[in-house]
Amino acid sequence: SKDSAASTESKDSAASTDFGSTVATNDSNSSSNSTSAINLRTFSRLATTTFAAAAATSTTNTYTGAGTDTNYNIPIYYKLTTVNNGTSMTFTYTVTYDNPATTTVERPTALSNSYAIYNTGTTNQTMFTLGSAYGTPSTATSYITDSTGAQVSNPRANTTNINKQGSGYTWANGYQMNGAQAKQGYGLTTTWTVPINSSGDTSFTFNPYSTSVTGGTNFFNGQKVTVTDPTSASTSTANSQSASTSTANS
């Protein structure tokens, strides 16, 4: 069901004309297996690539979940996409009020234009952990994406250091998305790449996080993505909910 406080329109017709590079898509390579208690579907749009020289296969997995913006009592969503090409893994994480499971653009009209959110916690918040097969991540780049997932040109992207935190990693929460952007169906996206060693544990965990820039509780309230094998279809767990996954292999 749609949030009564949000207006909707077709995502195909609502694509922004103000964006930079666009990620290539190949929907024909996607398959979706939903086990979500809230009937969230996930999808994988990143085209897979076979690296002939290394005889490696690129694997794309997408994990989604939903929370509640407790300041306005409306749904908010996260989407985490991983692309593993055998030598590195790229993580792309988006927080948005536009439900990724639908073909319409949900516009949270209740939001104040000046209201703003982060997609990460403080420096004390562990965002993700990595198994022994991974190298050390160095930087994360944050930017605003439109409802198709394309990066918009304004505001400009910002790159910050990834820091060790506890048993995992985090990045600074200075980049934000405001209500005016959210009401266009936009999302707050951060991406980072981690090298993969030849052997070892390739599991990882991810802790989705979002809150108002003025502080408060995590809108995703303890949800966690746990993946043991990122080269095959995996299931994320979020409390009693189970987010669906999609895998594209070539």
Predicted regions located by residue number:
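Intrinsically disordered, low-complexity segments of exported/surface proteins
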Residues: S1-S250
